[in-house]
Amino acid sequence: MANLLEKFKNRDKSLLFVPFFVSGFPDFDFLEKFLFKNKDKIDILELGVPFSDPVADGPILQEINYRAMVKGVNLNNTLDWLLDSGITKKIDVILLLYFNLIQNKLEEKLKRFKEVGIKGLVIPDLPLEEAEKLIPLFNEHNLDLILFISPTTREERIRKILDIAPSFLYCISVKGVTGERDRLPEEGVAFISRVKKETNKPLVWGFGLGSSYQINSLKGLVDGVIVGSAIGKRLLNNEDIQDYFDELYKATL
């Protein structure tokens, strides 16, 4: 097992900050410099491996995926970059990728992830039944398989997920795909409030976050926050994201 659960348990701040970036965007050099500069602010880095059909993503992250793929970014050079840069020695990294990328020679790839220092995987297109079968194999390679729950998940499946989840729960708090929203959805807040009563596993709010106000509003409800599209939008616009990143981080304290 990876140490992600311990990280939540032993945190000395209100929320763990989990920024999401797509590998190789805008380029590896920018990402490396930015991540090392901000390593003490990043509790867990969620790094997306570019994919041609990222079904969980909205238009911003779809565009970023496309641009990264055009540049030739893929799973292999992402892993090479992580290893060569030493990022995983300074930051806990989880990869978001689609099962197509790893299902062939799966065990060989899991061994590679462990060698690189990856702590866990988020696989949006992996059915729950398949995930349940794979958790022991992931555990053997010291990798957390991070499972999703959402307001549209059936009650019996929620109970199943809460029972088998080896790590924190990635809470999809809104219907639809990724993307920054103006306010927190009442349905998502109510859903997570209910789930919180049923489990002691950490809950991390994903999808729709983009402001320090929203993050502050989640204190006491969840254990961590993921911010992706809002960061990606600013990168697409060639904005300097440092001040914005600092603002998000401070809201998690």
UniProtKB/Swiss-Prot annotation:
Coiled-coil stretches are none
Entry GO CC: cytosol
> InterPro entries in the record, alphabetically?
Aldolase_TIM (IPR013785), RibuloseP-bd_barrel (IPR011060), Trp_synthase_alpha_AS (IPR018204), Trp_synthase_suA (IPR002028)
Pfam families, sorted: Trp_syntA (PF00290)
What keywords sit in the KW lines?
Amino-acid biosynthesis, Aromatic amino acid biosynthesis, Lyase, Tryptophan biosynthesis
**Which is one GO molecular function term here?**
tryptophan synthase activity
Q: Where is the active site?
A: E46, D57
Question: EC class of this enzyme?
Answer: lyase
- The reply to whether Transferase figures as a keyword in the UniProt entry is no
Under which pathway is this protein filed? Answer: Amino-acid biosynthesis; L-tryptophan biosynthesis; L-tryptophan from chorismate: step 5/5
Q: Keyword Amino-acid biosynthesis, does the record have it?
A: yes
What Enzyme Commission number does this protein have?
A: 4.2.1.20
Q: Which reaction does it catalyse?
A: (1S,2R)-1-C-(indol-3-yl)glycerol 3-phosphate + L-serine = D-glyceraldehyde 3-phosphate + L-tryptophan + H2O
Q: State the superkingdom.
A: Bacteria
**Family that this chain belongs to:** Belongs to the TrpA family.
Q: How is the subunit organization of this protein annotated in UniProt? A: Tetramer of two alpha and two beta chains.
Role summary: The alpha subunit is responsible for the aldol cleavage of indoleglycerol phosphate to indole and glyceraldehyde 3-phosphate.
Q: What is this protein called?
A: Tryptophan synthase alpha chain
Origin organism is Dictyoglomus thermophilum (strain ATCC 35947 / DSM 3960 / H-6-12)
